[in-house]
């Protein structure tokens, strides 16, 4: 197994460190997590049914092994109180009442959530929702787990999509915490215990001048979509290396255009369709005209912010830039061929000017910001 596959294997473990219904049974949540890990593990040797999870995964001590990313994610996604019991007055209720309150992270809004009757019932629903996730590699499996588990769970019970990560501070979902934990796991220094995260801000431009050149509504849409598509390709270059959970902004899960740049992963997942005809996950998601409309929405902005390993920040930025240049050249070459077909004559003399224009657009800028090792150095920066 190469280093990237080993990393994604660890990220799957980190992602599953908490079960999505943890808030319904805090005392048993570690056992629930192990149950999910056992159910989805793709490196399953023959006769592994009786193996302990630690033996199955090759992780000597499952929870101590990944608490550093868990603690980093907890610090990032919630307000830290002076002690563990502070702030308990605003708790998410459940389990006996089967009702809980989740709060908006930026405002005073609240929402009542009707929870599954028991934690065991929630586990059953969650197990059933990812039973069909199969993949050939840990990278693809992590992508599908990140992309589909929450969505499939919500289809069974909408409450499973919004259960909070912390019963004392119910203003962010467990899924956000799982995403961040996996993202921090990818930031381990050389695969060791120490985390070395950094922010990567990547941007295409100039957007206003490019959009202003539109002479029709169709031009306006085409320009917006091109920028959105190219940014999606840049994001894919990063997420292929460290997973989609690493992207802080924009929120990628469920965006049609991001699914489109990752189409090959969806098409590898096969099902039995109607009349026993082969079907793919891509067809199930976007096989209808109504669903396919979302593929034409330019929903990715011209920039993204990602949590990346500090030691690889520049490399990942370069990968993203190269992906944009490569995709724009592919699109440009196709357009040039079509232009030649429409002109019905030799236009090869136009090629140098055509390529020069492609070199000038877009302007790509990126910036990295490594996290400081301690509070004093962070405050001094």
PLM features: residue spans?
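Regulatory and interdomain segments flanking nucleotide-handling catalytic cores
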Residues: 1-381
């Amino acid at each position: 197994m190469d280093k990237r596959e080993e990393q994604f294997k660890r990220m799957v473990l980190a992602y599953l460190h908490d079960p999505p219904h943890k808030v319904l049974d805090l005392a048993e949540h570690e056992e629930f997590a192990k149950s999910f890990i056992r159910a989805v593990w793709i490196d399953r040797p023959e006769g592994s049914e009786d193996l302990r999870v630690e033996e199955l995964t090759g992780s000597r001590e499952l929870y101590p092994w990944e608490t550093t990313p868990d603690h980093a994610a907890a610090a990032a996604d919630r307000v830290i109180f002076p002690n563990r019991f502070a702030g308990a007055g605003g708790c998410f209720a459940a389990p006996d009442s089967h009702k809980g309150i989740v709060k908006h992270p930026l405002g005073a809004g609240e929402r009542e959530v009707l929870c599954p009757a028991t934690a065991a019932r929630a586990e059953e629903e969650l197990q059933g929702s990812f039973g069909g996730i199969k993949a050939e590699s840990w990278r693809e499996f992590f992508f599908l787990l990140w992309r589909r588990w929450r969505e499939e769970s919500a289809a069974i019970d909408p409450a499973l999509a919004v259960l909070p990560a912390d019963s004392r501070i119910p203003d962010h979902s467990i899924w956000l915490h799982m995403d961040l934990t996996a993202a921090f796991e990818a930031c381990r220094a050389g695969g060791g215990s120490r985390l070395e995260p950094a922010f990567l801000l990547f941007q295409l431009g100039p957007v206003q001048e490019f959009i202003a050149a539109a002479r029709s509504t169709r031009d306006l849409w085409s320009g917006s979509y091109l920028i959105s598509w190219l940014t999606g390709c840049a994001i894919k270059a990063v997420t292929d290396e460290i997973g989609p959970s690493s992207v802080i902004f924009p929120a990628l899960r469920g965006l049609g255009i991001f699914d489109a740049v990752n189409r090959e992963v969806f098409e590898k997942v096969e099902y039995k369709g109607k009349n026993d005809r082969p079907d793919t996950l891509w067809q199930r998601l976007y096989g209808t005209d109504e669903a396919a409309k979302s593929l034409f929405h330019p929903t990715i902005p011209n920039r993204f912010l990602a949590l990346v390993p500090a030691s690889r920040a520049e490399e990942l930025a370069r990968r993203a830039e190269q992906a944009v240049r490569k995709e724009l050249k592919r699109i440009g070459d196709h357009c040039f061929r079509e232009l030649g077909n429409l002109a019905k004559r030799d236009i090869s003399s136009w090629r140098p000017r055509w390529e020069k224009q492609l070199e000038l657009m877009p302007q790509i800028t990126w910036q990295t910001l490594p996290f400081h090792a301690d509070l004093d150095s962070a405050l001094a920066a």
